[in-house]
Amino acid sequence: ATIRVHDVRIQPRQGLPVVQWFYNDAILDWYRLKPFEEAFWTRVAPYMRNLVEHGQDTIYTPVFTPPLDGVKRPSQLLKIVRTGPDAYAFGWEDVKRYVDLATACGIRNFEWTHLFTQWGVKHAIRIYEGQGEEGRLLWPPETGATSNTYRAFLAQFLPEFKAFLDREGLLERSFFHVSDEPHG
């Protein structure tokens, strides 16, 4: 049998963002890296370029660990410090670095982490102190989606997130999750 291969390329889609989830924790596991250590940034860049080479223009950006993976391996870009009861400070440096690297690799749009758990939006997602390296959650996993604790967090996070998106020119190039499978 003979196989004939033709040199044909389909033009990238225009006006329809393309995204398949991109799991940083898989890269961390494969290369045995700590979340967002210097070696991570070198390893992740070729994967980002490969996404673009295969027609993807949007990347899932784990400002928090994706809720589906919250118990597997924390890999949140946002650094969070508890400054008091229901009070937090946020470090955006790694989020910015990730966005800048993805942009340099050809990514145009950004899909952001869910704000609530899947299967009915019943709970706050698992968000970690620091970047999750020690596995300390900011609240118990059963914390309600509308609890005072999570409302206090969102009241601090969302304005800072919006300011970050505005500052970086990302708001019009962003997609936001509330929850997956909301009716379970």
Segments and roles (model prediction):
Residues A1-G184:
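Aromatic-lined carbohydrate-binding surfaces of glycoside hydrolases
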